Amino acid sequence: MSKITFYIGEESYTFNAAIEIKLDGETKPNNLRVETILSEEISRYINNNNLKGKPKHISIEDESFIGECKDLSVIGKLEIRTK
């Protein structure tokens, strides 16, 4: 389970999602996989809650890793590090 946080304007939104940042068998997290799933989860959250605007200052966190990016408009910008 991972905690996802993002901002639309000055408003912060946080929710939990069943995303594993590093899967069993991976030597390190696959940024592209995590970024793709993160984008899908945030889009679903925005649609389900009728939010307007683009998510900014996005973070994903689990018990071992933290991933951060300013936005998801450009693929490959998610930076993941260990806690």
Model-derived regions, located:
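Short intrinsically disordered terminal tails
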Residues: M1-S2, R81-K83
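N-terminal acidic leader/helix
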Residues: S2-P29
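Acidic, low-complexity, intrinsically disordered interaction modules
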Residues: K28-C69
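Small side chains
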Residues: A17-A18, P55, G67, G76
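Domain-level marker for long, solvent-exposed, non-transmembrane regions
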Residues: I19-I21, S64, T82
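C-terminal edge-of-domain segments
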Residues: L72-T82
